[in-house]
Amino acid sequence: MTNDKYEITDIAHPEYPWLHRIRALQGVGKDVKNGDLGGYVESESNLSFEPKDNAWLFDDSIACNTAYVCQDSCLYKKSMAKDKAYISKGSSMSGSSIVEDDAMIQGASLYGNARISGTGMALSSRGGYRPTISGDVSVYGIVCGNFHLDGQTVILEGEKLYNQRDDRIILSNGIRYVERSLGRGTLQQGISRQVAPKEKKKDRTHGMVR
């Protein structure tokens, strides 16, 4: 397939000269116009150029080695996808966040110095809840759904966190608490549990001899 989305320029990264900036050959999404410069790649294998895929590298972000950014995902500032990282489903990376090794994020948002490593995963839930990960968080396990992680939180390999509820679970420096969704403290009309229909009373005189 011909890459009509972007070209790799001769502008080398000041610290990693084997990486080069990209330049848009057409508009990409709402924020990228034809001719705009983007972040750095090692090859076309790092950033999708599928038709209608608005995945993009902004600012000084990097996608290198065999890392792949696709499905409308965007990297900003100095974020980095390296090694065999896989960034998909509208994920967003900013700050100095990193996805590395064999890790993946799907529908997640990373900020600050957040790091997904090893075989770690940050995934959106079936209901569309996106985990947000910031601060100096390190994830080696799985985080899926309505979570916000910050501070020095560490998710160990083998640890699996799932939350598909409206209430957001916050993990910060070893403390876990709940951020209740709006409306949880009020009563709503028409919401009740189903009650089984009452059985008819039996005729206790049936069969009795007087």
Task: Please give the residue ranges for each predicted region.
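Low-complexity, polar/charged sequence tracts that form flexible coils or short amphipathic helices
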Residues: 67-68, 85, 108, 125, ...
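Short, well-ordered helical secondary-structure segments
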Residues: 9-12, 28, 97, 103, ...
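Surface-exposed loop/turn motifs in large extracellular/passenger domains
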Residues: 49-58, 71, 106, 122-124, ...
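Terminal amphipathic alpha-helical/low-complexity segments used for targeting or macromolecular assembly
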Residues: 1-54, 60, 78, 84, ...
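Extracellular beta-rich repeat passengers
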Residues: 111, 116, 122-139, 143-167
